[in-house]
């Protein structure tokens, strides 16, 4: 997602790269690029003028926002035939960190005199599945298949924080401010990383397990400050609140199966916000799911709904559904506090006061 939030770059197999309107994904265009790459990850430069996309066999391309042209980056030979899995620009855009299979990480920048690319020291041996940099500081987090979670400081030093043995698949850091990041593992663990901006090597990490959930985590992204969305396989979505340290269901797989079994067979590959409580999810089939608060839910139910609209790339609307939040009173109360109207919030506050008096 671009720094301005109005453009999304999508990528995947067969060298496919799409420019997508963040507010209306039906407005999209496939960019011209010939090749056989499978692109795995991409990131916008903080300046917003270009994006880097990386993939298998050391593939690395630059997408220019001025004319949406795609070109190979200089110095790509440094990566050899490594499968590149992750990329992130640091806070001020001075360096990009690129992670690959077998624990390899490079720091890279492109100067007038040519590429400046270096393999980093202190590496692990397992795949670097995700890299995420904080917006405010030149500090980045690294998550791996079994070497744990690492942090890169402004001097390009990699230190390992913990979480060894967990199959970490994704990490997300605040979009604007804050220094608390969230990482997830495929076996349903959530790590909260409190980044120390003055000495990143002593950053704190806490891990909680969510064994009762069905399926596996496959990634996450920030929805708004303090809130991230965790995608799961089979197709489902939960929210994790940093301030509360808890997770809540948004879209359950049973809802997806009931309304569209083909969608339920797909995988969530990414999401982005359009406001605090709304946004889009992109699926592995090239479709999009729009979610936003439902305005006309019967107040007597005491819970809110999320409107879901499914569209296909270049296609038409396939379906719409209302996925109600869980009937759990705890979750219903939390959802009401988050996105309820004023009357619902007042009613919820009264109910919570009554409950506290009984305890």
Question: Model-found features: residue ranges?
Answer:
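Residue-level hotspots at or immediately adjacent to binding/recognition sites across diverse folds
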Residues: 1-355
